Structures are given as structure tokens and as C-alpha cells.
Amino acid sequence: MKIRNDREKRKLIQSAAIFLSFGAVMYFKNRLIPKYADDYPYSFIWEGDKNGNLAFGKREYRRVRNLRDLLKSQISHYKTWDGRAIAESLVQLFLIKDDKKYFDRANTAVMLLQLMLISALGKGKKGLKNITPSEALLLTGGFFVSAPHLIATCFWLTGSMNYLWMGILQSAHVLPYAMHYHGRIGKFPRSLSFLSGILSGWSTETGAGAALMLSGMETVRALMKKEYSSWMGWGLAGEILGMLLLLLAPGNKVKLRIENECSDTLPKTMEESLPGYIPLDYLYTREMFKKWFKEGFMVTILRELPLQIPVALYFLQKKDRVTEDDIYILGLEAVSLAVPSVMMFSPEYPRRATYPSVIYLLAASLCALSHLNLPGYGELSPGMRTAVISAVAVYIVNVLSSLIVDSDLSYQIDRQIDHIKANKDREMIFVDDVFIPPVYSFLAGDRSINWDVVMGVCLDNADDPYNEAAAAYYGSGKIYTDSDTDHIYEKKDFKSRLYGIINPLKSFALKTREIIFGAGDRNKEENEIQKET
């Protein structure tokens, strides 16, 4: 008994160490990601009568400074933009403070909570003590590698509130249904189930739909097995009510009109279209479905492919008849696949919208792993050991490269902000554009800030809503971004390429010191690091 207890204690310590290490790295990464894009417009009270804060036409800006401002802003937002009242309220709540550190701390905690909820969904057991070290590695590594559009869904303040934080509400609502399937609970408070259903349904469109699908599947199974309890129906009713509040918001129609008439979000031609967006004339044409399949569906499926390995091994090792676990894994797989599939019929397909897919696929992968009898590392063949070491090495390089890219871009954006503050009395302010270090960006892929999300403080159009909001945020004149800057990162000679390798490492070292010990004399350090540019 003592030996068994010691073994369990050792596993618990190892799992806790994995989660804490992952949390520390993710907190560091959170600190590196600056405010950008929608973070500036959402810092102000939403004024729907002037086309809102994200479209051309707004000229007056008043910061959200208290809960009264927030309530006024969200009422206007709900009537004139979209129905994501819970997510956008959280966005504006954390933007009341200028310092992003409060969000960074909370966001890291929410990310770890999301992994714990995924574990409970997959195994039907709550708590760290029920997670083995191998499962902890799958949860942390699998989430980092497979979460779609990681920066936009889990680190960008506005995006994280809409996807990571709303994923908490969705998976928390589904959890009692999962526990019921595993026979862990029978009774559950109806009022709590109804409330969690409303919160889940009123979150985001794809996530709410996925939660409704999974909870509905378990409710139907319970009815067929004569295991139904009234709280399950109350939860579904709450989910449906929440989705109605989300989808029938008066602002949804207004937003579509504004984006078509007064904004540059929707492109005018296919050549101008950004990933996930298409001109109105091409909606529901062959070109739209081809674009969505290539840029959205397949990217999500391929990104999540590593999580299918435990599932494939699970079914390959099976020799007996179909079990309850088989059905549960297939149900999670179906919900995961439904998310990118449904998005094929959406008028917009930003990859971040498929975030809920990774929640349920990771739960399925964890459930499969918990039933596998895998050999220890010492029992593996030399070829398998090499494969494991190679996979770990690639993962470490990917994580480190993403931190280096984010550090370098963070310093570039800090310089933009310092320049704006130092010259805010001028009528026009010109800032250098930001550039991505090519070598580390290649190694990091989309696990770091990349061309799909990077924009610095603003864009190259001084009249763009983002530029106007950033100028109002810092109390400056019009801001222009010099997109024609001949940056050394874009040059092909040997010296420039060497600089593109060494300079980001210096940025990483300085940013690490700044986060750990404080900013210090940042301007002096930045002048030194950029004097060769």
C-alpha cells in the first residue's frame, strides 16, 4: 500500500510540475503579446449611431472607465454590432486598465482551467490527481500545437475573451452531461444547469452549437436508456435560450450592412480578400467553398492531426466488441469535426472561429490515451526512441522560436508606442512598420504573431478605424505607418540574414529581463539593439 501511495504521489508531483511549467511559459508568452487591432476600439464606449468603433465614420472617443460606461457601451454594441454580450463585456472590463498585466495573469489561469476541464470531459473524472504525467503532456503539448490560430484565440485580448474564455463556459456546461455519461453523477441542480446553459449558448456561435450538440446527444442517450433526469432538459433549454439571445441580437443585421457599406473588413475583389473573408458577390459560390475548404477546413484538420494518433492507436488495439468508451470517443470526434464543417456555410471563415473543435478532439484523444497500454520509454525500440526525441526537439524549437518572434515584435511595437507618446502634440505622426524575423517565424509557424495577425499599433491608413482609435487612446494626432520602410529583415545579403538571427535573440534576452526585473531604461537598450538597422 505504501509503495502504491508513493507511486501515486510521484505521479501527482510530475503532473503538477508539467502544468506549472506550461503555465509559466504561457504567462511569459502572454506578457509578450501587446494590445493590437480590436483592443484599441474596444477601449472606448461603443457608439452605434456612428457605425460603431470598428467602421469608418466614428470621430468621438470616450474611454470605458467604469461599470456604468461598460453597460452603456454594451447596450449599444448589442443593438448595433453583434450578440456576443458576455465576451465583449469581458473585453471591455479588462481594457478599463491601461496595464495589460491583469489580463495576462487571468488569461494564464483560464488556460490552465481549460485544460483541467478538457481532462474532466475526456475521463469523466475531475482533479489533477486523476491526470497522469503522460496525459498532462498530451494536454499541454496537444493544446499548444493544435489550437487553431493560437495567438488570435488564446493570447490576443479581444480574441481570447471570445474563444478561450467562452470555451470555459461551453465546456463547463457540457461537463455534467459528460459526467452523467460516465456514471459519475445522477442528480444535478436544475437552476445551475439552466444558468450554465444560458452562459454557454450566449457565448460564441460555433462553440455554443458544439456544446448544444454534445449535451443533446447525451440527453437523447439518457432518454433511450431510461436514465434521463430533469436537469438535462433544463440545461438544453438554457442553451437554446442563450443561443437565441446571441443569434437574434438586432446588431447582427446592422453589422452586416455596415461591413458592406462603411468598412474595409469585407473586400471588394477576390484579389483583396484576407483569409476568412470574401466579397459579398461571391457568397455561396464555388469560389467561396473552395476558399473556405483550403484556408479554413483543411488548415484546422491538419493542425489537429497529431491529436488523432492516440485515437487511432486505441481503435487499432481493440479486439472486443463496441464499448461505451468507443461511442463516447466517436461522439467527441463528431462534435469536433462538426465545427469546421459548419463553418463551410458561414459568410465568414476566420480560422479562430474553429477553436471549439480542439476542446472536444483533445478530450477524445485523452480518453483514448487513458485506455492505452503504452510501453515505457526504456521499452521502446531504438527507432521509436529517435522518433520521440525528434518530436520533443521539434516541439521545444517551435515554442522557443515563437517566444523569440513575439519578443522581437513586442519591442518593435513598444518603439512605435514610445514614438507616438513622444510626438503626440504633432498633427501627423509617422511610425515605422513592424517586421517579422523570417528564420524564427518559419520555425514558429502560426504559434507566434505572424502575418495573419500582426499590425503593430495601427495600419497604413491614418483614417482607418484602428488608427483613429489608437490615436485617441494615446491622445495624439493622426498616425501614419510607413509600410515602405526598407527593413533589414527583408534584405537577402549575408550580413542582413545574420542580423535577422542575432537581433531577435537580443530582443528575447532584453524582454525576458524586462518581464522578470522590470522595464528599466528601455529606450537606451532599444537604441543599442537597433543601431545597426
Give the label of every model feature segment:
Residues 132, 137-181, 204, 301-303, ...:
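Membrane-interface micro-motifs in multi-pass membrane enzymes
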Residues 190-193, 240, 329, 372-399:
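Signature aromatic-anchored transmembrane alpha helix within multi-pass, membrane-resident enzymes
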Residues 12, 128-138, 189, 228-235, ...:
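Membrane-interfacial loop-to-transmembrane alpha-helix junctions, especially the N-terminal start
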